[in-house]
Structure formats: C-alpha cells, structure tokens
Amino acid sequence: MEKLVESLSSNQKRNQALLHPFEGNEALLELTKGRLGNEEPCHVKGAQGEEYVILPKHLLLGLVNLLQKGREERVKLNLERDILQQMPIDFEDVWEVALQEIHRENANPSYVDTKRLIKEIKRRHPNLFFQLGDLFGRAKEEMLD
C-alpha cells in the first residue's frame, strides 16, 4: 500500500498512458511509458488534459479495505468517548450493549451515530450509568441529617 501512495503522489510516474477519444463510446488507450498489469498504478492523461489512474483490482480493494478499517476505528474511538461522557458504571457492559445494538440493527459500523446510540442505551438501560441527580440528592439528604 505504501508503494501505491508513493506512486500516486510522486512526480516520477512509471506507467503512463494517453486516452484518445474514438467513435461513440470508444476510446484508445496508448501506453507511452511502462506497462499495465504490474503492481503499480497507470497514470492516464485524457484528450482535454484530465488525469485518471488505472489500478489493479487487488490494489483498489486493498485501498478500500484500508479506508473501511480507518472509518471503523474512528467509530470505535467515538463510541468510547461517548460512553465515557455518559458516566458508565461499567464501561465494558455499555460497550457490549452498544456492539450488540449495532449488530442487531445490521448497521454499518463505520456509519453509526455513536452519540445517539449511547443516549438511547442510557434511556433504555439507566442501570448501566451513574445518575448524578440521584447521587447529589442522596448527598444533600445525608448532609441535612
């Protein structure tokens, strides 16, 4: 994946091609440097100067997979932050309930609204969280006694 990023950002493009419009929906791809089919992208310049990149399928799938994992990691970090902000009694219990909810709803883990999810869990399972109002009320009663 590092070679892909390096090749895309480098001025040294090993594989280059020109795209020539043809009749109708057809076009001719003329390789001017390098070749198709190796482990690197091919940089294609269109007739109007627009730039394209042709990638081997496995590189594209690897890139998509890497992006998906990054999104899922970001959601996990957001989920952790949102759980902690709601003051759980046991973080692991709330984490498990949240993961079960995500799987139960067949939600894509990379697109979950974690704030909404945790607030809904707190509403349905208040026993999993500290209730500050109750704590302050009890402390006040104890001080008055």
From Swiss-Prot:
This is UPF0763 protein WS1752. InterPro entries: UPF0763 (IPR019724). It comes from Wolinella succinogenes (strain ATCC 29543 / DSM 1740 / CCUG 13145 / JCM 31913 / LMG 7466 / NCTC 11488 / FDC 602W) (Vibrio succinogenes). HAMAP family: UPF0763 (MF_02110). Belongs to the UPF0763 family. Pfam families: DUF2603.
